[in-house]
Amino acid sequence: MVVVLDPGHNGGNAANPSVINKPVPAGRGATKPCNTTGTATNAGYGEHAFNWDVARRVGGELSAKGVRVVFTRDSDTGVGPCVDRRAALGNEAHADAVVSIHADGSEAAGAHGFHVTYSDPPLNSAQGQPSYMLAQALRDGLRKAGFGVSNYLGSDGLAPRSDLAGLNLSTRPAALVECGNMRDAGEAALMSTADGRQRYADAITAAILSYLGD
């Protein structure tokens, strides 16, 4: 089994706007900027760092179960890769599952909770039932671990979208997890601790293994 983990954004993005603002294919005939900086907690803990830490923890747990893990980036100090390249890495690895790890930055009053996104309407067979089942597994795993579903986006923890390049360009089962809202005080506090990030990682790992049939 092969799982591609895609920790969103990167630590060097903010200092390289000319690189990350370059338009790249986003699927459905659209383009998008190569990448973005991501959000942060009000105290300044960056989403890129959260994504990276959680992804590394998930990768370690999956590797211990015999899963081959591929990361779309190898540090939290680089730039990119662009969203189209991230999708290509999953395709090239013939991944059984591609999971993008993110956190949201909504400033809507009271906005909190996680949501999982998949490409809809699907552009290929992998984006159909396989990606939907992966998204469901991630939703169920996070909820089982005690995380609440989003009260501001999607329905029952699922938020299908048609505009995300990494999902649109994937030919493998793919889903994107927004673990919570970094602008919510409670979720920001959890994300800012190693114990909190381990909780997210454990839930995501269990969900992926469930999807893979382990």
Model-derived segments and spans:
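Active-site-proximal helix/loop segments of hydrolytic enzymes
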Residues: 42-214
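Alpha/beta-hydrolase fold active-site loops
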Residues: 1-2, 174
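Active-site-proximal loop motif in hydrolases
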Residues: 2, 7-54
